[in-house]
Amino acid sequence: MIRVGIVGATGYTGIELFRLLKKHPSAKIVYMSSRTYAGKKMMEVYPSTLEEAVLEDFDSRKISESCDVVFTALPAGVSYRLAMELQNVKIIDLGADFRFDDPNTYAEWYGNKLEDYNSTERVYGLPELYRDSIKNARIVGNPGCYPTSVILALTPALKSGIVEVDTIVVDSKSGVSGAGRKETLDYTFSEVNENLRPYNVAKHRHVPEMEQELKKIAGKDVKVIFTPHLVPMTRGILSTIYVKTNASLEKIHRIYQEFYAGEPFVHVLPLGVFPSTKWCYGSNHVFIGMQLEERTGTLILMSAIDNLVKGASGQAIQNMNIMFDLKETEGLESLPIYP
């Protein structure tokens, strides 16, 4: 049985880790910490958990002695500092601290300088692309939610060289839980309900993460124009991507089917069928659809994920399964909740 710790257990990604790990047949939660709610029972914070375990302060020695792997679900800059105290434990970080190859890029976009950053010690945790590296990693930087939806949707097209990469336009819609569990006016009911708005236009922190990984896939520089929008729903991301191509829709669709054949969580939809966030709700599944705008030679790709599962906690557990040589789908077999 894998002994698991969750640092930052009371945020939305933390509680999603708890929900998924409680039904994982090969994992046991032995440690949970919360800076805000230390000393309280989990069920005092989330009554739905029925969990009597008491949340603790961060204790590096206790984690090192009692855990085989720790999930860190913390603000930018915090995970890296705490992870440096945990030298004998596998770490899966759901924040941004271990996603970047170049610490200067991270510092530029997140405003935090990571001292003594060793990019060779960490692996970018997108299983469909890097499972062989993840298997032997000690530290995994779990991808961001938007990058997950965009990278998976673009990878087959970029790898096959059938699209232009100088300008890729991405329009994404996300549920409010993507902003985290915090008291902010912009995310109150009256501000969000019956409202749709863009945010962080042309300056979202996920852009350099997308470009870093897409460059590796394409083998050359990739530029992404990214506009995220907040929509009045709890979970889900729908990304619509526009990219130029000379290939036929049938050829592109065949490339995608072949690339993702055998992947347990990525589903390429039949032509004429387009994804819905409702199909992913509460699950680790990804749905990808496509259409060709023939007048302009524009390939329109669409992907849907649950931002808290495949976009965060579910993908983190998928990475854990790989790191411990388990079946990749273990603990993640649940179908989406519908309706």
UniProtKB/Swiss-Prot annotation:
Its EC number is 1.2.1.38. GO terms for molecular function: N-acetyl-gamma-glutamyl-phosphate reductase activity; NAD binding; NADP+ binding. It is an enzyme of class 1 (oxidoreductase). Keywords: Amino-acid biosynthesis, Arginine biosynthesis, Cytoplasm, NADP, Oxidoreductase. One of its GO terms (cellular component) is cytoplasm. It is found in: Cytoplasm. InterPro entries: AGPR_AS (IPR023013), AGPR_type-1 (IPR000706), NAD(P)-bd_dom_sf (IPR036291), NAGSA_dehydrogenase (IPR050085), Semialdehyde_DH_NAD-bd (IPR000534). Pathway: Amino-acid biosynthesis; L-arginine biosynthesis; N(2)-acetyl-L-ornithine from L-glutamate: step 3/4. One of its GO terms (biological process) is L-arginine biosynthetic process. Pfam families: Semialdhyde_dh (PF01118), Semialdhyde_dhC_1 (PF22698). The active site is at C145. Coiled coil: none annotated. Catalyzes the NADPH-dependent reduction of N-acetyl-5-glutamyl phosphate to yield N-acetyl-L-glutamate 5-semialdehyde. Belongs to the NAGSA dehydrogenase family. Type 1 subfamily. This is N-acetyl-gamma-glutamyl-phosphate reductase. It comes from Thermotoga neapolitana (strain ATCC 49049 / DSM 4359 / NBRC 107923 / NS-E).
